[in-house]
Amino acid sequence: MKVILKENIDTLGHIGDIVKVAPGYARNYLLPKGLAVEATEKNAKALEHVKRQMAYRKDKVTQAAKLLLAKLEGITVELVHQAGVEGKLFGSVTNMEIAAFLKEKGVDIDRKKIALAEPIKQVGEYSVPVKLHPEVTASLKVNVSAPAAAE
């Protein structure tokens, strides 16, 4: 029996694949659980329509991520933190602080998209990747400095 998969199934294939399975497997497992539909002419046409819609949505999201990438290219995050003599920070800079700085600048990014491997604990300039979309990753400049000593 041929079925069209509605979910990714490791042993069979990906969403939208037309696969041949045993009739009992289809009737007793795939169809009742909503993991697949029978491969008819009508269902195949509906699948093509859904694929076109998904491609359109994916294209739209990718374009939005690229626009956000262009915004981020011109921004340098400037953070001032108390630091010791050797440039070691009292505390650390996290992705939450970077996201708050960006929000002040008018760029709203979820902190989870800022891929900071570990918190920044030294004064200096860093390049931090921001995963806007699976296909689009921006590189954000973060400059951490100590406040100027008052004399």
Swiss-Prot record:
SUPFAM superfamilies: L9 N-domain-like, Ribosomal protein L9 C-domain. One of its GO terms (molecular function) is structural constituent of ribosome. One of its GO terms (cellular component) is ribosome. GO terms for biological process: translation. Keywords: Ribonucleoprotein, Ribosomal protein, RNA-binding, rRNA-binding. The keyword rRNA-binding applies. Gene3D superfamilies: Ribosomal protein L9, C-terminal domain, Ribosomal protein L9, N-terminal domain. It comes from the Bacteria. Belongs to the bacterial ribosomal protein bL9 family. Binds to the 23S rRNA. HAMAP family: Ribosomal_bL9. This is Large ribosomal subunit protein bL9. It comes from Pelobacter propionicus (strain DSM 2379 / NBRC 103807 / OttBd1). The gene is rplI.
